[in-house]
């Protein structure tokens, strides 16, 4: 089973190819101020082992650098994404999931349905059925439960000073939909932390 993947595209002559598949927001990354990445320069590999990868890149946007570490675990993986900027900006960490939630959202969180992400350009118009999750006051961690084939999964993430959104977005083929997690922060320097675990190993 596939949890997440790079979509490639639906054909270079397709409208959705240029409006979504080749756009920053369709990837598992951080979007700054609703804009596409402005640099396509390669990053720097800091370390690489059989179970981990640590890499960074400077000037993804003007005066913005990324560093990402991924560590495989015996029952899942840990993903850490650090963002640094010279000034306060709006950060959206987006993670697309080829799976469906396996939980009752209305009894677990306060939810605000038909929400807006505030952007319509650079692929944001393709996010549909947007729900804002409002965890209990003072919560520092959010746990979501998923079903992927015969597997039961849990994703946990740090949500201090974070707005949490869930949405549907096009997959490839575009008739399929993915579930997109969007973690929004306003900051100069922040680090996102997400861990995925298989519960029924």
Regions found by a protein language model. Give the residues of each.
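CBM-like, beta-strand-rich accessory domains located in the C-terminal region of large
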Residues: 10-201
